[in-house]
Structures are given as structure tokens and as C-alpha cells.
Amino acid sequence: MLTKKEQRLRRARQTRIRIAQQGVARLSVNRTNLHIYASVVSEDGTKVLASASTAEAEVRTQLGAIGKGGNVAAATLIGKRIAEKAKAAGVEKVAFDRAGFAYHGRVKALAEAAREAGLQF
């Protein structure tokens, strides 16, 4: 029987395979208890085109009023930032890779903020 972490990693691997077959850039999300990370990876998976996280110094100063980086408000901020950076890099359409995490809470907030800021997925 697989542990919860092994199940999540298996789902993530299967998702990456499906996204690679689509031939579009991938918006990859990873979350920890303290931070949330997002990056836009090229179609072939070799280059990171844009990235944003709550661990960045500039973001931490913006989060001063909100609190730590492990909440929905911080995920919303990262969603907007990654969409702006992706559009600056010339990426409009992506496939959402939630890395096996449930589409709920911080992951959902990041995705919705990125959509509102102009990314299509």
C-alpha cells in the first residue's frame, strides 16, 4: 500500500506525462507549510521561463500586512505575480500542474488569481 506522499508523487508524475503530450508550457505549483512556489516551465521541460514564490524578499515585504506565506492571501499574490511574469516572457497559455496536491485552498487560490491576471488554462 502506498503512503499518502507516494500517492501524491505518483499523481504528479502521471500529470507531467499528460502535460508533456499536450505541447504547452506548464504552470507548476509546489506548496509547503510556510511557502508556496510557482514556476512556468517550457514545453519540453528544459527551461524555467518564469517563477514566483513567497520566499522572495520582495514578496515577503508585501506580505508584511498579510502575514506568513502559507495562507490563501499569499497564494493569491503569487498567482498574480506568476501570471505577470509569464506574460512578460511571452507565455499566454499553460497547462496547470498541481503536483498531485488537491485543487483546494492555496492551490485553488493561486490558480484562480493566475486566471484572473490573464493566463489561460
From Swiss-Prot:
GO terms for cellular component: cytosolic large ribosomal subunit. It comes from the Bacteria. The keyword Nucleotide-binding does not apply. GO terms for molecular function: 5S rRNA binding; structural constituent of ribosome. GO terms for biological process: translation. Keywords: Ribonucleoprotein, Ribosomal protein, RNA-binding, rRNA-binding. Pfam families: Ribosomal_L18p (PF00861). Gene3D superfamilies: 3.30.420.100. The keyword Heme does not apply. This is one of the proteins that bind and probably mediate the attachment of the 5S RNA into the large ribosomal subunit, where it forms part of the central protuberance. Belongs to the universal ribosomal protein uL18 family. Part of the 50S ribosomal subunit; part of the 5S rRNA/L5/L18/L25 subcomplex. Contacts the 5S and 23S rRNAs. This is Large ribosomal subunit protein uL18. The gene is rplR.
